[in-house]
Amino acid sequence: MSSIIHDVAIVGAGISGLSAAGRIRQAGLDVVILEKSRGLGGRASTRRMKLQEGVEVPVDHGAQFFTARDLRFQDQVSRWQEEGVCFPWSEGFMTWKDGVLHDPDAQWKDTRYACRSGMSQLGKALGEGHKIIREFTVDSVTLGEGIWHLHADPSHASAPVHARALLVSAPLPQAMKLVGSQLSTDQQDFLARITCGPCIAVMARYPDGTECSRWHGIQVREPDSPISWMAWDSSKRKKDAPGAFAVIHAASAYSSRWLQASKEELKTAGEELLKEAALIGGEWMNRPLDLIVHRWRYAHPEGPSAPGGFLQAPCPEPLYLVGDGLNGGRIEGAWLSGLFAAEDLLLKIATG
C-alpha cells in the first residue's frame, strides 16, 4: 500500500475536476487527479479521424462549443484565446422548428467558442502540470482514521490512493455509487431529481471539398425528432484543413433505445439519424463516405442546480460533489462548479 497521503484527491479529469485542481494547486496544496480514461476534459472530447497514412483530423463528438457569461469564466476564456486554445466560432445557430429552418434569433446571439484542434484542447490546457493518474477506475471509496482511501477496479493492479479531502467530479449516477452513502437524506433526494440523459453521436465524413456555408450548427426544436443537434464540424477547422465532417447528436429519448446496442446496431442508428439530418440540412447529408457512432451514457443533465453549484457531504472529512449536472449544465457551469467547491474547501482549511 502506498504511504503517500495527498492533501486532496479528485475523481475525474473533466472540466469541473480540472478547474478545482487548478485552484487548489494555486493555493499550494498537493492534489492528485484520478481519471478512468486516457484523455482529459470529460465530454469536451475529440476523436482523431484518420484520413490516410499520416493524416488525421479532429472531430468533436462530445461538447460542441461553450459560452462565457460569468466574469471569472470570461477571464479564463480570454486567457485561452491569448494562448490559442479557443476562438469565437459562432454568434448564434439556426433552428429547425415546425419543419422550417430558421435563422439565428438575435435575442440569443451570444458568442459560442470552440477549439481549432478540437474541444479536448480545453482538458489539455486545464490539465497542464497536474499530477494525473490515468486509466485509474475508482471502484470504491472508504474513510478511515481521517483519511479517504480510493481503491481501483479489481482488474487493475493499481495501489489505493489516499487523501485528506476528496472531490468527486464523475457523472452524478457514478458519483452516487461511489459516495452516495456519505450524503444526507436531503442531498440524496435532491440528486434523485437530476437526470442524466444519454446521447448517440454520429461523425459523418463527406468528400473533400464539400462545403456547408449556410450553417455552422442547427438546434433541432421538434419534440418528436430523433435529432437534437447538427454541426458542420469542419467550420471549426482552418480553411485549408483536410476532410469534411458533420456531427449529429441524437435526442435523449431516441438515444435511450440504443444504450445496450452492439456496434453493428449503433451503425444502424447512425444511418437512421443521417436520413433525418438530410431532411433538415440537405440530401447530401445522407451520402457520407463513412460514419462512426459514439454512445455517451451520461450526456444531458437536467434538473435543479445545487446551491453554490456543488454539494458538500456532512461527513467528518471534506467530501464534495462537483460537475455541470449540479450547476446548470454547460462547460461554463462545470468550470464554475469546480472553482466554487475548491474555494469553499480552501476556506474551510484556512479557518480550521
Walk through the language-model features, giving the residues of each:
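Core beta-strand elements of the Rossmann-like FAD/NAD(P) dinucleotide-binding domain
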Residues: 4-6, 156-165
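Conserved flavin/dinucleotide-binding core of flavoenzymes
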Residues: 39, 48, 242-352
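Glycine-rich FAD pyrophosphate-binding loop
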Residues: 25-52
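N-terminal FAD cofactor-binding segment of flavoenzymes
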Residues: 46-94
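Beta1/beta-strand and adjacent pyrophosphate-binding region of the FAD-binding site
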Residues: 2-16
